[in-house]
Amino acid sequence: TALALLGLPGSGRTTALLGPGSPLSFQTEPHGLLGLGHWGRLQLRLSLTLHPESLAWAWRLEQRNLGTEPIETTLVMTQDVGLADYGAIRLNEFYVSQYLDHQPLTDPKHGTVLAVRQNQPQGSRHPQLLASSLRRTVAYATDALQVFGRRARETQHLPAPQLPLPSRRLQHEHAMVALQDEALSLAPGGGGHTGFVFELCLH
């Protein structure tokens, strides 16, 4: 999973909220993780919450503008999906990826919901994943090539996502769930939250 926050007026800056370059410090919680920190004039609180009874989890980002000018931010989530046995993915993830079917669905409140199904049987099952914004998805992608372009092959670190996401289904060799959340406008001293929710179904 990768979460990228884009914002800070006039800068075009981007930060990864997960991984070694994250501005957050993480600690474990009873049902997930909690990350706290600052990025520029933004105070950030990122939580990962696991559902206690279902195969579901949610990322929630709370932001507060500590500056004296308005700020607009955009949160982008990317999830590398396999929906297959661990051994099969480690053996050839490109092969596994070709059997994933992506279906963008439309929800009147939350915008695009991405449904992903593994068409190659895993035992007797075909795992499915649903991914949605907690607010409203305004754009999506289904392959890493759409998100990072060919630049990702030329560097050890992933480049910033290419926005806006194309909102077009591409079923290539690097299946990815990518959702671009509706921009969040923060007045001076104001706060707001964004995030994404996932549910795994084993049918």
Please state what every model-predicted region is.
Residues 80-82, 178, 185:
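Residue-level preference for alpha-helix termini and adjacent loops
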Residues 25, 43-47, 62-64, 72, ...:
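Ser/Thr- (and often Asn-) enriched beta-sheet segments in non-cytosolic proteins
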Residues 6-7, 78, 199-201:
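Predominantly extracellular/luminal cell-surface or secreted proteins
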Residues 71, 184-201:
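Short Pro-Gly-centered flexible turn/kink motifs
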Residues 7-12, 21, 104, 118, ...:
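Generic low-complexity, intrinsically disordered sequence content enriched
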Residues 35, 50-53, 57-160, 192:
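Polysaccharide-binding surfaces and accessory modules of carbohydrate-active proteins
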Residues 1-3:
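Beta-strand-rich N-terminal accessory domains
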Residues 7-54, 154-180:
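Extended, loop-rich substrate-binding clefts of extracytoplasmic carbohydrate-active enzymes
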